[in-house]
Amino acid sequence: KEMPNVIVKNRAQVFGYYDHNMLVMSERINDHLPKSKKYSPKQRLWYIRAKEVVISSGSIERPLIFGNNDTPGVLLTSAAKEYLKVYGVLVGKKPLIFTNNDSAYETAIEFKKNGIWPIVLDTRSNPDSEIINEAKSMGIDIRFSHVVIAAKGYKKVKSAEIAKISEDKKDLGKIENISCDCICVPGFWTPTIHLASQS
């Protein structure tokens, strides 16, 4: 912000990328203020012509899909970790973490550091990484080759149906019901390429 050749627009979003590096941006000027000036615009549309463009639009976390995954108490692991680390809020006291990658273990470790014992279900058969070994050394309950079949509970998660899954991911073992009050899911990350695909 202090650089003389940089303009920062905080409440703005680029939504179009056209020929010859022309971008279109919408800026929200005062729609967030409780009382705005009488004749000031709520939004402003910018047409930007750039010599060069750097797109850093990030990625979107995908959920894993299972029955009743729209029940209150089912959320992304990144959201659960954010609530805990930024706001000091536990999303549950008996969390179940259902994953197919290593990113969930960061959330499991955060739960454990805050006195909560999570259960981790990992679709992979025997993954090996530093963060998984750290979770194991902390005594976190990890069940490999397991999946969530469905969330159970009326108005909120009270339990989950889980099962062991075969190596080829086609067959399920015996279905069991385990008690939990939230289900955290990280599916993986999808790059946000919408602007890049317009250029």
How should each PLM-predicted stretch be described?
Residues 1-199:
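Residues forming the flavin
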